Amino acid sequence: MSEQKLAVNEYLKTDSDYLRGTIQEGLDTQVTGSFSDGDQQLIKFHGFYQQDDRDLRNERKEQKLEPLYSFMLRARVPGGICTPAQWLDVDKISSTLTTSNSIRLTTRQTFQYHGIPKRNLKTLIQGLDKAALDSIAACGDVNRNVMCNPNPVESKLHAQAYAVAKELSDHLLPHTRAYAEIWLDEEKLVGETVEPVYGNTYLPRKFKMAVSVPPDNDVDVYTNDLGFIAIAEDGQLVGFNLVAGGGMGSTHGEVETFPRLADDFGFIKTADVIKFAEAVMTVQRDWGNRVVRKRARLKYTIVDHGFDAFKAEVENRAGVKFAPKRDVVIGDRGDRYGWVEGIDSKWHLTLFIESGRIKDLPGQTLQTGLREIAKIHKGDFRMTSNQNMIIAGVAAEDKAEIEGLARKHGLMGQVLTGTRGHSIACVALPTCPLAMAEAERYFPEFIDHIDALQAKHGISDQSIVVRMTGCPNGCARPFAAEIGLVGKAPGRYNLYLGANFEGTRLNKMHKENIQEAEILAELDTLFGRYATERDAGETFGNFTVRIGVVKAVNDAAKDFHG
């Protein structure tokens, strides 16, 4: 592979002086709102992407203006936990330094800002730093934000799992001081240590990691490059089942790319988590495809080299053998809405945030509501991988005041079906440069149609996992949804069916490049059959496989496109 011409990103990383590139020069140049092509790749490692308003692109072109460039910045918040004081800072930044005046909760349990002018980037990052937050490695070819189940019931076990997620995030951070020098004005140190895990080429591609606490699977653990499924005995964490090789991204029409769920490798002790995480990452660093970038994810490395060879090399580098995996039940991927009491007698309020967008609208002043709650809350805020928010650690005597604020600002009280509560969508248009169709802006209306069809057929009590993305990169994990809509062109989507409710089987394309009317007509027919033909307890995804609408995907490399 070394004799072949590498992907252009590999040369950019090698020549970047550990992710510095010419970012500082680009930041100093205010003649344009953009960075150079090479630096646009490097800034991802610092936590942000260059975008433009695609709604205005043609108009500005006619006016002979450059696109209306702005930046999307994603924070690193392992496990999605922040304090009320931090949230107040996050909120203030969105109101003063972004043009979107909103906060977007993501499908990876953190938040991001949209509409940041280049001139505001440094001030914004310094504001995050003052709040003890950062965006280091939130994007780029590195380990990204580590997810962890925010289970509000088993709080002791959650605390133990969260500690592991936080340790993973901290241990696998890049060591380069480029972020501190460029954005925080810290001095460059003489004789900087090279990256001990990443090297100067970092990873071949993005790397996503999650820690789950069964039976909940809200983090969609099998869709990650590396996942740790907590195993408890008598309520205490004893270790994890390790899974590796998941990932959602693919490319329309290219069968050599496909989504994939992770393989089960075996059980490891808690004390060995860092060893195994580093071993998996360094094997991917050394074995991953650096020639064909679309085949660079860990899932392809395992497929190309073989499971047994990959497992043996991981064990060799970790210096520990996998034990047989422990039996575990994988259950619901949704969040528990409303109040739930934890084992510590504290209460936790999960608030539904449609598509994760926190913004003040008529009748729903969500951003103001969370701000007012943060001013009085004594616990913490927990972002979920379903784009929702948990007001965690509320004393019984404080519940009424918190709930009053939530209801006043439209954070509670909305009619929420099981299907809407299990639905997520990516941002897509107008800011995402990869989007081929709408997602976030259209998704609430689409779910209205789904709710109406379920009501028509008397199946409103059935929760169905529905997800929509504007392109096949899969940010909202659509290929693990019972109903997945993936953008193909404006107003057109590929319809995927057949994933299971728990997230341990992928879906498969049922209809290609169809519009809303055909999508709804197809689902109308299937919902009618599901209402009358389903077995007791049978979920919609399993039903579509059983009656032969789509075939089960058991081996994505062979079955997803076949």
UniProtKB/Swiss-Prot annotation:
GO-annotated molecular function: 4 iron, 4 sulfur cluster binding; heme binding; metal ion binding; NADP binding; sulfite reductase (ferredoxin) activity; sulfite reductase (NADPH) activity
Residues the entry annotates as binding siroheme: 475
Residues binding [4Fe-4S] cluster: 426, 432, 471, 475
A Pfam family this chain is assigned to: NIR_SIR_ferr
Keyword field contains Oxidoreductase: yes
PROSITE patterns cross-referenced by the UniProt entry: NIR_SIR
Enzyme class: oxidoreductase
Signal peptide (from-to): none
Cofactor: siroheme; [4Fe-4S] cluster
Keywords: 4Fe-4S, Amino-acid biosynthesis, Cysteine biosynthesis, Heme, Iron, Iron-sulfur, Metal-binding, NADP, Oxidoreductase
An individual GO BP term: cysteine biosynthetic process
Biochemical pathway: Sulfur metabolism; hydrogen sulfide biosynthesis; hydrogen sulfide from sulfite (NADPH route): step 1/1
Source organism, top-level taxon: Bacteria
EC number(s) stated in the UniProt entry for this protein: 1.8.1.2
Cofactor binding note of this UniProt entry: Binds 1 siroheme per subunit.
GO CC terms in record: sulfite reductase complex (NADPH)
UniProt catalytic activity: hydrogen sulfide + 3 NADP(+) + 3 H2O = sulfite + 3 NADPH + 4 H(+)
Function: Component of the sulfite reductase complex that catalyzes the 6-electron reduction of sulfite to sulfide. This is one of several activities required for the biosynthesis of L-cysteine from sulfate.
Assembly behavior: Alpha(8)-beta(8). The alpha component is a flavoprotein, the beta component is a hemoprotein.
Family according to the record: Belongs to the nitrite and sulfite reductase 4Fe-4S domain family.
Listed HAMAP family: CysI
Protein name, as recorded: Sulfite reductase [NADPH] hemoprotein beta-component
Species this chain originates from: Shewanella denitrificans (strain OS217 / ATCC BAA-1090 / DSM 15013)
